[in-house]
Amino acid sequence: MDLFDRINKLKEEGLDQIKQAENQKMLDKIRVELMGRKGELTQILHSMKDIAPENRPKVGQEVNQVRDILQKQLDEAKDHFLQAIIAQKLEEEKIDVTLPGREGHLGSKHPINIILDDLESYFIGMGYKVVQGPEIETDHYCFEMMNLPKDHPARDMQATFYIDNEDLLRTQTSGDQARVLEKHDFSKGPLKMVGPGKVYRRDDDDATHSHQFQQMEGLVVDKNVTMSDLKGTLEMIAKHVFGQDRKTRLRPSYFPFTEPSVEMDVSCFNCDGKGCPICKYTGWIEVLGAGMVHPNVLENAGVDSTVYGGFAFGLGLDRFAILKYGISDIRDFYTNDVRFLAQFRKEED
């Protein structure tokens, strides 16, 4: 067998092997055996020095033609296997568009936001405006404007996070009231506002305490505002949130920014006032604090306390949610357990 017959035989055998190859691995083996560094066609090229000079160009040309033919067939076979793999994956992963889609999971409002949105809508309906102020407040607006000068002993009740000597994380939203009160034009009508927002106290977090919680404070200032106006407003709030059959009572209390000051209780909705562990067997549950605006608060804002008076109240949105929904641990509000939050989806309607 002369050299040209050998080259032609390698071509025919190579084409036959490529045709019978079943996968890419077999194609790679054929390529290495024929055209690799030690492949048979490569060895022929390496032996050119032993070939007669007049035959070298023809042998080289013949070997390169065979290499090109084999490489073309290898590429086509490789592409065939690749297309087969793609087709198989498409078949395995295809989607039947006629099948029903997965049902979307609806989110739900946070229980505190449910209470907040409900109360905001309720107060707006009664002519109040909603005001939101800064969470980083000044000592002046948080305390001094609220009849709590720097030497006032009641400051010890606040357990404040101070940033520096003048700035702090607000312990109450009363600063919003002070800012609005000193700018309000009473020639255009009375002042009626609520101020919701986050407040901060230096409390250790446990089942009933949190260093951050949410409040809503209300303020009404006008001529001839009486304690009866306050009592009626508080009763409407309690019945709106906790049910029309709730009974209410006011107890004397003390707050530096109101005089007189009261705390409001509602009849226990667990035992209907008969006495149980929730109400500590008193039949009553404390829900908020309130009172008639202290004359010093009015004067600090530039309002003549001999002409104008008013009432203020403050309620904890967290506490309202705890009482209304029977939540036992305040930490549930901020641990982001979807199972806990999903319980309140029906309350949004």
UniProtKB/Swiss-Prot annotation:
Localization annotation: Cytoplasm
EC class name: ligase
UniProt cofactor(s): Mg(2+)
Top-level taxon of origin: Bacteria
GO process terms (BP): phenylalanyl-tRNA aminoacylation
Keyword list, A-Z: Aminoacyl-tRNA synthetase, ATP-binding, Cytoplasm, Ligase, Magnesium, Metal-binding, Nucleotide-binding, Protein biosynthesis
InterPro entries: aa-tRNA-synth_II, aa-tRNA-synth_II/BPL/LPL, Phe-tRNA-synth_IIc_asu, Phe-tRNA_ligase_II_N, Phe_tRNA_ligase_alpha1_bac, Phenylalanyl-tRNA_Synthase, tRNA-bd_arm
MF annotations from Gene Ontology: ATP binding; catalytic activity, acting on a protein; magnesium ion binding; phenylalanine-tRNA ligase activity; transferase activity; tRNA binding
Keyword Protein biosynthesis: yes
Cross-referenced SUPFAM superfamilies: Class II aaRS and biotin synthetases (SSF55681), tRNA-binding arm (SSF46589)
EC number of this enzyme: 6.1.1.20
Any GO CC annotation of this UniProt entry: cytoplasm
Binding residue positions for Mg(2+): 259
Any Pfam family: tRNA-synt_2d
Subunit architecture: Tetramer of two alpha and two beta subunits.
Similarity annotation: Belongs to the class-II aminoacyl-tRNA synthetase family. Phe-tRNA synthetase alpha subunit type 1 subfamily.
Name of the protein in its database record: Phenylalanine--tRNA ligase alpha subunit
Gene: pheS
